[in-house]
Amino acid sequence: MTTEDRVEIYTDGACKGNPGPGGWGALMRYKGKEKELFGGERGTTNNRMEIMAVIRALAALNRPCKVVVYTDSQYVQKGISEWIHGWKARGWKTAAKEPVKNADLWQQLDAERNRHLDVEWRWVKGHAGHEFNERADQLANKGVESV
């Protein structure tokens, strides 16, 4: 399967102060077409905005799709592809038996992921000149400015 058969989603989160006002952004690409999404919250964290960007992008897809998500957040990439299995098995507790931070958003992200046929998670280095990741960053900053 080529990437042309998949929806590509580039996501980012931003926060002015952590916690503080924050924003999320997502650039969605499919067969030459693009859609930009962004939003913000007054009192939030960077990690919450990173997760929210992916939730909102996956939710914007009207039907089950094959998706590649690109994120510069190792927290998101590892959380959804590695850590979430243990969290769920332990009733949303960490290995240290502490409540999982942002469990509400992880649960939403898990539900959105499960709506789709296949979701692949790829980490990209942030602020390294990757065109589409830079655009997601700009959208996240627009989200901060919107609150």
Swiss-Prot record:
Transmembrane segments: none annotated. Binds 1 Mg(2+) ion per subunit. May bind a second metal ion at a regulatory site, or after substrate binding. InterPro entries: RNase_H, RNaseH-like_sf, RNaseH_domain, RNaseH_sf, RNaseHI. Its main location: cytoplasm. GO terms for cellular component: cytoplasm. It comes from the Bacteria. Its EC number is 3.1.26.4. GO terms for molecular function: magnesium ion binding; nucleic acid binding; RNA-DNA hybrid ribonuclease activity. Keywords: Cytoplasm, Endonuclease, Hydrolase, Magnesium, Metal-binding, Nuclease. One of its GO terms (biological process) is DNA replication, removal of RNA primer. It catalyses: Endonucleolytic cleavage to 5'-phosphomonoester. Belongs to the RNase H family. This is Ribonuclease H. It comes from Chromobacterium violaceum (strain ATCC 12472 / DSM 30191 / JCM 1249 / CCUG 213 / NBRC 12614 / NCIMB 9131 / NCTC 9757 / MK). The lineage of its organism: Bacteria, Pseudomonadati, Pseudomonadota, Betaproteobacteria, Neisseriales.
